[in-house]
Amino acid sequence: MGFEVVDWTGGLAYSGDWNHIGWTVAASRRPISSSLLAFGGAKDPNTGITWGGVRATGVSLSASYDRGEANGVWADLSAHQITGKNVADNQRQRLMAGYYYKLINEDNRRLSVGLNTMLWHYQKDLSGYSLGQGGYYSPQQYLSLSLPVNYRQRTENWSWELGGSVSLSHSKTDSQRRYPLQGLIPDSLPDKFAVEDGSSSSGVGYTCGRSSNAVSVRTGRSAPASIFNRRRTIRRATR
């Protein structure tokens, strides 16, 4: 496909139930696709060194509780080692959890509200694109809280959904070397030992969207889904 770094990815998962709690444990090696550098790698024109192709290898445990009644909860815990070709090694831990309450809980109609939270931690900030960096978002602290609202309904021929959320988030990155793998950088480069300052930011955002699908009873064919999404984020950054 023309990528500079090509290797294997995959995963295994096993699911079960315990006291009405559904759970899944998984082990995987997955590509990080947040940039072309992270996903497929790049070649430095000055040194001829190839770097990038970042992969996350680790385990995750997810669980959920929903007996079809008004309340439901879910959680996901994961830990990964993040590596790449000529990219500094990194570690990632993530905890995500949520609660939802069904204000309307009928066979063909449902309205739910909830509270979701995410807590991420990366050992290093390797979000840059210089030699040795990974080109992926990797804050040392990331915390978000969101309040989702979702309504869905179906009839004999139609189904549609409306949803939206309001969220608060905060992130922090530590200072980092511009070139984290010093052995790759020639001594003649004037900024070989340069350091990028850390930063912190807080933000408020919202999402809203709708989707619908028309189904022909006589032919069994589905008309194309029409999806409209709108997103806006307001952020405040400090250094």
Which role does the model predict for each range below?
Residues 1-239:
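Gram-negative and organellar
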